Amino acid sequence: MGNVFSGWHLLVILLVIVLLFGTSRLPKLSKSVVEALKIFRRSFNEASDITRSQDGHPDSQGNFAESASSVPFVKSEKQSEKRASVTEAKKSK
């Protein structure tokens, strides 16, 4: 496929971004983009660690994750209340 963007393409894209957002907003925009990339990278690494631990490999700190069967299931009060109200509604029909 070759090189899709040449230097001129990137220059035009940069010029359009400056015209759309203005020079006063660019620092805020770039900070937001960098922060979003950091969050994405952190989430991706956490997901990779979970996948590795499920395959029997330790995460980045050398710890193995607990299997889903060893983690107890705890119902919240809201779930119990909601289930009770749904059951009552069905009985009243």
From Swiss-Prot:
Pfam families: TatA_B_E. GO terms for biological process: protein transport by the Tat complex. Residues 75-93 have a biased composition (Basic and acidic residues). InterPro entries: TatA/B/E, TatA/E. Residues 49-93 are annotated as: Disordered. Residues 60-70 have a biased composition (Polar residues). Keywords: Cell membrane, Membrane, Protein transport, Translocation, Transmembrane, Transmembrane helix, Transport. The Tat system comprises two distinct complexes: a TatABC complex, containing multiple copies of TatA, TatB and TatC subunits, and a separate TatA complex, containing only TatA subunits. Substrates initially bind to the TatABC complex, which probably triggers association of the separate TatA complex to form the active translocon. PANTHER family: SEC-INDEPENDENT PROTEIN TRANSLOCASE PROTEIN TATA. Part of the twin-arginine translocation (Tat) system that transports large folded proteins containing a characteristic twin-arginine motif in their signal peptide across membranes. TatA could form the protein-conducting channel of the Tat system. Belongs to the TatA/E family. This is Sec-independent protein translocase protein TatA. The gene is tatA.
